[in-house]
Amino acid sequence: TFSLNFQKQFDNPEQELMIDANWNIGKHYRESSQTLDYWNPTMPNYEKRDVSESDNKRAVVNINYSHPFFETLKMEVGYNLNYSNRYSIYDYYLNGSDVRNDDMSYEFYNTEYINAVYATVGYSYGKLSGQIGLRGEITNLNGRKEMLGKDNDSINKQYTSPFPTLHLSYQITDMQSAQLSYSRRINRPN
């Protein structure tokens, strides 16, 4: 794992530039086995062993800049890059054999790029405050599954997604406030 962090403070403490970059490389190995012994003599016993290993690479870069225009108005802009690359091998063996079962074994390649930019403006005036923003993402997904002697399955997708945000708040008393929010989000598996 490699990380780089940079923070620039300006004369105004509300104005700042932050850059974070992370790079991770990982290897994973797993072996498991399963045995089914039947009491019924007409059914043969069954043994399965599988081995999987993978190489994973991941990079994340965040650049965020915030700038106050007045005491009541602040803008934030930023960029985010999320890159992941995974290569996995899945080998299956049946009935105690050390010969790989090519009908079930496969290799999988996966690459994902997500580039995003965002801008938000926050304001406050008396008892009213709010924030409005927009994040735009371009996602590229590439995946390929290879099996010996079979047609390879692959997926190549690119899509653009907008993510608007709106948040309004009104301070009724020192102990009460009314809020209204809208945001569009996406949850991705890691």
List PLM regions with ranges.
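Face-selective signature of the C-terminal outer-membrane beta-barrel domain
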Residues: 1-146
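Short coil-to-beta transitions that initiate beta-strands within beta-rich domains
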Residues: 106, 162-163
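Outer/extracellular conduits and scaffolds centered on Gram-negative outer-membrane beta-barrels
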Residues: 111-115, 157-162
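Surface-exposed extracellular loop regions of Gram-negative outer-membrane beta-barrel proteins
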Residues: 140-142, 174-190
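Glycine-rich and polybasic anion-binding loops at the starts of cofactor/ligand-binding domains
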Residues: 169
